[in-house]
């Protein structure tokens, strides 16, 4: 059963015992919602000390459930949405209407929990939501979200009725899709035409009609009396390449192709509706792409995309400060003193160079600890970074806590995120293994409970 909990609690300084807290939470499972109130102890787990003898396994204190969870900060998420909205609607710009924000909640909300994140963002003022598929859109709609939902990767044949039934706005990326959508829309009891958005392929060569096919599209649309074009979009291939480069030039060319095609569409008498092309990177660095609506993805969750160290990127981060939304946590479930020359983990890929204290964490790659972090990454323990050693297992991870005085069994460990005054950001963790932040965030698996805290 996949569980999500909505809760709040009071933080206490490290080392202080906290009273048991009465908290209400909501569990989401298989589309059903069950409200519960439960007393959950916030006291520190029983203390244990490292084994005195090399090789002796220390006793694990009794804990309720498997100690791995992801804390999702509703206040940080709200902060990021408001920061983005203000950023793309500068006070000195003269616009009749403010730019809209379409919050991307695909991929289970970048691992944060799509339906729950969408509810928080709707309350915070998001205008639209973006999902990958009709099934994702239905989950968000069933969570009670009322704002428009755009299905970004279009739809499969046979899904048209679900789109209409759940009031989901599809993206059309092939002219042939219009006829099937129009047939289903003609059966609706509503007299208003069914709205869709058109995707143009301006250089990514993935999805979308070519700008040279605009005339064909306009001709096909004229035959579909039950459809209405509600918006036009494209997607950038390299907008995170801030510094002058081949990739930066590609983005400029994509912008040019898009706006030329848009003017052709208008010349053919077709109102494009809401124009949108700015993704996270373009929001941060390319104001000329903001148009009528922007589509923040990873920046909603607290991170600027890519890892280009250019001055332009640094300036974007200064102008648009974000707060990390998710912290992935676990606990130390075992401590072991090992001598120098001891192999640790599968294949003994890590061999100690000195007498060491090895901690075992109750989380592995089956939870979202990237397997590539073995021997390359670190975790946050008591405000210090402890290296991950050996190969990351499916269910556990080993760390070297020799340099973390007083580390105990039951100790809370932050894989990435925020722990009090200390931060171990996911983008730095991603950079250490040569991947992108979204890869880490989306890897948090279904068996990890999400705790929505304020």
Identify the meaning behind each predicted range.
Residues 21, 35-37, 42, 47-50, ...:
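C-terminal accessory subdomain/extension
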Residues 151, 229, 332, 388-389:
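A structural signal for short, hydrophobic beta-strand segments that form beta-sheets
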Residues 4-12, 22-169, 439, 449-454:
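A charged N-terminal "starter" segment
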Residues 70, 101-105, 129-131, 149-151, ...:
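Hydrophobic faces of well-ordered beta-strands that scaffold small-molecule active sites
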Residues 94-98, 271-274, 423-430:
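Flexible, glycine/charged-enriched surface loops at secondary-structure junctions
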Residues 43, 63-66, 107-124, 142, ...:
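Active-site loop/helix belt of alpha/beta enzymes
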Residues 77, 140, 232, 332, ...:
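Residue-level signal for inorganic ion chemistry
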